[in-house]
């Protein structure tokens, strides 16, 4: 089987996305690679496809347990034998997994960077053929990155202890030129193929709101996006609790996530979000890295993040499936002071000397200034982000850059009028924030501004907008079926099939194996597992429609 056969058989795709094939070919030719690709561009396939074509094992160094579980779960569902080794497993489970790996059962093993330093894992690694080491979230290796992890610095020493140097591939979605240079140097990549597909996420609409009544804004937004999944980020636990309580009191289906909750609560709440039981989560920035939920339709920042890197990473959790989604930042000057406090009172890193820590604090304050400038710019928000990462977008129109997809480039009078109603807390309604869903609906009726707001007139389209009314009904039926299957097999719904795959089913209406395998995202293993039950659901839906028409 060649690379195209692997792509179709396991992952259900007929062709590679831009940039993927170049990196796959480089790896198969034995070259090191560095892929800097935006979230949702398909970085994982760049190493997963060649891993299945090489003779040995591919080790994927990954920073988060949740990310490993998601990736391994998705691979297993696709028919790929993969495993993860991290602290969530017992010693017995780790011993068993490594024994299976020695027997050749696993082609891909995800491992935490700390695990590379243990004698047991090194002993395993020196007795098996390792074809490639993939460094995921590679920006974690740089002290200049926003997510520096000292354990990443030990990857190269691990490589040097192996009998034969494997191919090294590294991937990240966010890397300034300084971080990129660190990745190349610290991992000692040899004549690497470097691919930057660009940081632009054209499916994301960026908005900055200078408003004071943030609670009313969020409440109205969620009321008008009841069917959508989203994340609301807050800077503090206190704000998470406040926003969660307000939304919950108004009858909205939300959950919460922050470090103050017990491990059991965090897992339960995270699962509620991932499994679409609670479509919206209110969280601190501790939430999200490693969450591969593809159908997040909006990310709202209740507070301004500390830097553009953090903002773009967090906002980038919207629209991973490539469908239109919104990223809204609610700015207030108080956010600057909160972030300065966090920077100046950050816990010292014992792995960095005092002089270096002082330099990093200066850098963090510069990053904060850049974040504030983003919130205050009157120019294109997308252009600001791209230039920050060293990319200059094409401007064929000349003059001021216009992306036609941010709040500074698209002036919506109805949206501006709606925003004016949120300028002063308490100005918009005579009563305080409503305490139940009925009152929320009444507020929406009574507020002309809200009725005309961009939530109803937004230019961004929902994925299912490609469908007619019956198609949307079928899409919702298939989503419900997907949720039931996901719960029964214990994986997130998007691991079964993405929204994009379900929409393609609704458009193609498959009734046999050949037709189902033509649906984007349906590989042979997924067809064997779920093809018939989804085709039966489609048939039952259409049969019901026919009977209704016959009456």
Name each model feature, range by range.
Residues 1-3, 337-338, 347-356, 363-365, ...:
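Accessory DNA-binding and partner-docking regions appended to nucleic-acid-acting proteins
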Residues 1-10, 14, 18, 22-44, ...:
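Helicase motor core with emphasis on the C-terminal RecA-like subdomain
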Residues 20-23, 371, 502:
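Short alpha-helical "packing" element that flanks the helix-turn-helix/winged-helix DNA-binding module
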Residues 26, 301, 374, 504-505:
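Short alpha-helical segment immediately N-terminal to, or the first helix within
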Residues 66:
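Conserved Rossmann-like nucleotide-cofactor binding loop
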